[in-house]
């Protein structure tokens, strides 16, 4: 409404002072060559712009209200008031009564006006208010979500504790604990087994704790809990067998691979695993305290600090290797027991078959002693010995051959007679 009142008043004044304005327009045209250069795309100032400018200065005094500036801009058709002045001082003065938006924009928009600037300011203000309102709502929603999450976490924590209490009070809990401990004991080094026993000694405290939590609370569904406990015990039992298989097979393969690496390093470097750097035992005794102190202080300056030293197994690794060997030995005995027994019997049978009875060998030895100078029985002697001993001719021949080999150098008469016989044949 204020805009319309100013606009009508200015139009009436314009009609009354038309002649005076024509004279002023002529003066302005004469001054245009001396004014600063304007953009060619902008329209030149008109008499209406000049009239409005003069009326704003004369009627509204300081001319600082945004509504008057908006009215002048609307009538001017979007032309910038800065281009209507002839000096920089006039331009700076005109900027004093322009609206903040118009002064900032410089009126350079082709179809912009003061009224549109006021509308845009109102829209920006409303937008900011709506953003602040929506931001506060988001903060409230976040707080509510955080509270809900905290409540859900507390409920879930209580449910977990309640489930643990029901499991501890179940009849199959002892079997479940035993199966779990059995899995732990399989690959645990021997020197660390007391830690498991110490934890088992404290199990009563844990049972008492959860028993207190479970008092006054309804138990879980017996069917679901029974099914869970049964399946979990079976699962741990199956897992125990898998761990045993892993220790017997895969762990032993790892131990053998490590041993092969040690042998390869020994062949390349010539230093056996476990050998020192040439220091004597007395030097080791002197440096023992210093090495212990450095280890406790966190120093890692030793030869094995970065894993580049000799591959010396630790005590836990030795115990694990010994356990693996015992397991494999027991497994081999159980799997190949029958074959081992058969092989042993076969060896003994062959030994018995190759060894002659004592009474028969005494007869052969008697003949050997009586014919020590020439221990070569004739065919008649062999046939008689076959009858006396009951042996085969092949066995008698083999016995005399072996006997001559055993006593070849112990009987000098035999060797000398053999040599003389050989010379006579030549």
From Swiss-Prot:
Residues 327-347 form the ELK domain. Keywords: DNA-binding, Homeobox, Nucleus. Its main location: nucleus. Residues 348-411 bind DNA. Gene3D superfamilies: Homeodomain-like. It holds the Pfam family ELK. Residues 104-114 have a biased composition (Gly residues). Residues 1-26, 85-158, 270-290, 406-426 are annotated as: Disordered. Residues 15-24, 139-151, 413-426 have a biased composition (Low complexity). It is found in: Nucleus. One of its GO terms (molecular function) is DNA binding. One of its GO terms (biological process) is regulation of DNA-templated transcription. Ubiquitously expressed in the mature plant. InterPro entries: ELK_dom, HD, Homeodomain-like_sf, KN_HD, KNOX1, KNOX2, TALE_homeobox. PROSITE patterns: ELK (PS51213), HOMEOBOX_1 (PS00027), HOMEOBOX_2 (PS50071). GO terms for cellular component: nucleus. Disulfide bonds: none annotated. PANTHER family: HOMEOBOX PROTEIN TRANSCRIPTION FACTORS. May have a role to play in formative events in ovule and embryo morphogenesis. Belongs to the TALE/KNOX homeobox family. This is Homeobox protein knotted-1-like LET12. It comes from Solanum lycopersicum (Tomato). The gene is LET12.
């Amino acid at each position: 409404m204020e805009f319309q009142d100013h606009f009508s008043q200015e139009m009436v004044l314009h009609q009354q002072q038309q002649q005076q304005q024509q004279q002023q327009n002529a003066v302005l045209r004469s001054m245009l060559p001396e004014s600063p250069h304007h953009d060619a795309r902008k329209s030149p100032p008109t008499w209406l712009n000049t009239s409005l400018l003069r009326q704003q200065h004369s009627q509204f005094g300081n001319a600082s209200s945004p509504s008057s500036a908006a009215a002048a801009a609307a009538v001017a058709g979007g032309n910038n008031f800065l281009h209507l002045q002839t000096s920089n001082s006039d331009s700076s003065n005109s900027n004093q009564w322009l609206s903040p938006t118009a002064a900032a924009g410089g009126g350079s928009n082709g179809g912009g006006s003061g009224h549109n600037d006021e509308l845009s300011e109102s829209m920006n203000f409303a937008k900011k208010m709506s953003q602040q309102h929506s931001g506060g709502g988001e903060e409230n929603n976040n707080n509510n979500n955080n509270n809900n999450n905290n409540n859900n976490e507390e409920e879930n924590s209580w449910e977990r504790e309640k489930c643990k209490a029901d499991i501890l009070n179940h009849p199959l809990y002892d079997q479940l604990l035993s199966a779990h401990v059995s899995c732990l004991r399989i690959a645990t080094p021997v020197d660390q087994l007391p830690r498991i026993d110490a934890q088992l000694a404290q199990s009563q405290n844990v049972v008492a704790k959860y028993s207190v939590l479970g008092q006054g609370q309804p138990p879980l569904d017996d069917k679901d809990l029974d099914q869970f406990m049964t399946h979990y015990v079976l699962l741990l039992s199956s897992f125990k067998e898998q761990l045993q298989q892993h220790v017997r097979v895969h762990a032993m393969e790892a131990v053998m691979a490590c041993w092969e690496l040690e042998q390869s390093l020994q062949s390349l470097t010539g230093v056996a695993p476990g050998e020192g750097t040439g220091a004597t035992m007395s030097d080791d005794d002197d440096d023992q305290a210093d090495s212990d102190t450095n280890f406790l202080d966190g120093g890692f300056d030793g030869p094995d600090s970065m894993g580049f030293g000799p591959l010396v197994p630790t005590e836990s690794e030795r115990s694990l290797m010994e356990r693996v060997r015992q397991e494999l030995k027991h497994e081999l005995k159980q799997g190949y027991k029958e074959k081992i027994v058969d092989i042993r019997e076969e060896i003994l049978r062959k030994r018995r078959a190759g060894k002659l009875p004592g009474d028969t060998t005494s007869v052969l030895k008697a003949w050997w002693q009586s014919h020590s100078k020439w221990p070569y029985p004739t065919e008649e002697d062999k046939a008689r010995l076959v009858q006396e001993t009951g042996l085969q001719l092949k066995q008698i021949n083999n016995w005399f051959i072996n006997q001559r080999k055993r006593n070849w150098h112990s009987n000098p008469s035999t060797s000398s007679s053999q040599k003389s016989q050989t010379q006579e044949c030549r």
